[in-house]
Regions:
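Conserved "HGTGT" condensation-loop signature of ketosynthase/thiolase-family condensing enzymes
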Residues: 1-106
Length: 106
């Protein structure tokens, strides 16, 4: 007879988000509650031969106004070594750690 693994409790102590609605939990949540959409017309590359002309993209900028600036979350030298989604994960993870107030020394 197989025994079931013991259930472990998980506690969420911090949150972080990077979404098409903005960088950060507060910005995303506020815009979501206002009924805003992250879907926008694609204007960063030519879509004339693509059927879909809209997408949900991460809002880029200097980091002000809930825009995403990867340099705030990872050194440019390190960014060149990884796929872009890794910088997204680092952004959300750092926000969650800051929200939790957890800043390990090592």
């Amino acid at each position: 007879m197989r025994s079931e693994p013991a259930m472990r409790r998980v506690v969420i102590t911090g949150m972080g988000m990077l979404t098409p609605l903005g960088c950060g939990v507060e910005a995303t949540w506020t815009r979501l509650l206002k009924g805003e959409s992250g879907a926008k017309k694609i204007d960063t590359f030519d879509v004339s031969d693509i059927a879909c002309k809209i997408a949900c993209v991460i809002p880029r900028g200097d980091g002000a106004g809930a825009t995403y600036n990867p340099d705030q979350w990872m050194e440019p030298k390190e960014q060149r070594k990884v796929d872009e989604f890794i910088t997204f994960a680092m952004c959300a993870a750092r926000q969650a750690l800051d929200d939790a107030g957890w800043h390990p020394k090592t």
